Amino acid sequence: MISFEFPVTERTRILLRLEYLYGRLAYFIGKDHPHDHHAALQVLFELMETASRADLKADLLQELERQKQMLEALRDNPNVAEETLEGVLEEIERASSQLLALTGKFGQNLRENEWLMAIKQRAGIPGGTCQFDLPSYHLWQQRSAEVRRQDLRRWAAPLMPTADAAEILLHLLRDSGKTYHYVARKGAFQQMSGGKVVQLIQVAYDDNLELLPELSANKYALNIRFVSAVTGEARPRQTEQDVEFQLTNCKF
């Protein structure tokens, strides 16, 4: 099976982008080659731009508090594992405290580092980080992998509270999902929403099918069509075959 996730709200879209970028950051930092650590720096710069919204911190804190209140209401529910519930509540409390401790604009530690900002500026130019353009950067790349890794972790540390918050919220959101099995007749599927709005939609189907799902959703209807995934075509075409798939609606 292959699964695709589609954010329905802007908040969910930001959470998924943060998760994607932090995942890449962890991967490249864990590697040893200078090229990998160059990629890690580029991800840091992407994170700085992605999470620079002034209201991101407030949004995350608001959603964490809302989830905390909803979960606290389950404490006396005999169908809920108390130990698991308390563990999640502790994670939420820890993530909230770390976010509250953040001061200044997100990524300010990076913006105030002139050396890093020089690399960021040159990285936007094709081939702009050659050694003759940035000799001090070339020198840094020649240091041991562990020294570079420590630097990267130090630069990334002030950003990590948003990673923890995004991870917790996406975990709770995905766990809320309800899965249904459907068939898209001749590659098309429509479902009336009845005014119900979800935050995340997952579509899963046989990974042997050379198809891609295209989705549009609002509070009135959900439309999915499966199109050809063959590269080189001018325009993807909707398949003529019936497609069995799983649809998961996730909502806090």
Curated annotation (Swiss-Prot):
Key words of the record? Cell cycle, Cell division, Cytoplasm, Septation
Its cellular-component GO annotations read:
cell division site; cytoplasm
Major location (coarse): cytoplasm
Q: By its UniProt entry, which Gene3D superfamilies does this protein fall under?
A: YacF-like (1.10.3900.10), YacF-like domains (2.60.440.10)
Pfam families reported for this sequence: ZapD (PF07072)
Domain of life of the native organism: Bacteria
NCBIfam families this protein is in? PRK05287.1-4
> So what does this one do?
Cell division factor that enhances FtsZ-ring assembly. Directly interacts with FtsZ and promotes bundling of FtsZ protofilaments, with a reduction in FtsZ GTPase activity.
Q: Which family does it belong to?
A: Belongs to the ZapD family.
Q: What is this protein called?
A: Cell division protein ZapD
What is the species listed in this Swiss-Prot or TrEMBL entry? Chromobacterium violaceum (strain ATCC 12472 / DSM 30191 / JCM 1249 / CCUG 213 / NBRC 12614 / NCIMB 9131 / NCTC 9757 / MK)
Per the UniProt record, the lineage of the source organism begins with:
Bacteria, Pseudomonadati, Pseudomonadota, Betaproteobacteria, Neisseriales
